[in-house]
Amino acid sequence: QELYMAVTGTNPRIDKGEKLPVNRVTWYDAVYFCNELTKVTMGEDECCYSISYIEKDEDGNITWAKVSWDQNKKGYRLPTEAEWEMAARGGVQGGWDYKYSGSDDINVVAWYDGNAYENKCESNVAKNVGLKKANKAGLYDMSGNVYEWCWDAMNEWSRIYRGGGYYSYSSECTVIYRAYDDAYERYNTLGFRVCRSL
């Protein structure tokens, strides 16, 4: 949340905390953030996305926009689904070493339905990032905590997300599990991770 707040000046989360993952963002909010982060760190000329015809809800969340990706740009962007899976596997192409990102034991690497409760009387909530073991590439929370939007479309209106969330069953936190929803949807268990082409 800390970086999201610094770049956009807003925080879409209900439960606030600098080290919590940003969530409750639409796919459109995520690509917009990527451009804003690029402008701040690299300049507008390196923005990967052209975003036009933006529509927002009463809270300022983007609910629709026309988005195209210039793959020659080096700015921040959402990973493709293939890039996301390679990162979740620790950067090992074709490596099927672990069921989850960094381990076969989900409790070592992920916050999910089975361990995210503070106690059985409270509801699940996202946890601070980096509290579980990293994978081989040094990446945290690629299984569990919050799902992550990817660039890829499932159909005209829907986008893929990966990784599982704190409210997910263990089967949804594997490196191969994939889901999708309308790009305008936002949930407590859905966030994103940025990447760059080098």
Regions found by a protein language model. Name each.
Residues Q1-I14, E18-T38, A87, G144, ...:
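A short glycine-rich, aromatic-capped structural motif
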Residues G9, G164-Y167, L198:
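Intrinsically disordered, low-complexity segments enriched in polar/charged small residues
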